[in-house]
Amino acid sequence: TPKILISDRCQMVMPYHIDLDTYEEARLAGKSYGSTKSGIAPFYSDKYAKIGFQVSELFGDEAELKEHIAKVCTLKNVMLTGLYNAPELKEEDVFNTLMEYKEMIAPYVCDTSLYLWNAIQEGKTILLEGQLGSLKDPDHGIYPMVTSSSTLAAYGAIGAGIPPYEIKKIVTVCKAYSSAVGAGE
């Protein structure tokens, strides 16, 4: 059994997310938000616009995946060429990248919510680890110098796909002030 599992519902950061993040930081120049240029904001934008790629799509109907790729390339190419004066995405390149991802992650993909639910039923201990802290939360942090996903403990259950009442203990680490990577304040 692998020591790491990847949810079949996991969204994937694509190389063009990193490119878009980099292009946007350059466009904003001195007024940027200090991105780490790892593609996180464009990734979340795609996730919530329902145009991101889910791991399960890699193992589904290839024609549907190619249709999704065509839709994404059409949308992204408007932004890439019109706003950033950057090269267009090629459908074949996006498809090939996704197939590389598929090959890399195939042994690790499963229904992680079911896996965790079974662990709960067996009385096993589950450790959920969050990131950053409340001052970087998009709803409760120092906006706009926040991250793109919720950093609060309550979202641990949501992200893991387990009922919130199964979280029995929360341990937090708090700092006296907020700090960040990139050009964050």
PLM feature segments, named:
Residues 1-185:
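Non-transmembrane, aqueous-exposed alpha-helical and coiled segments at domain scale
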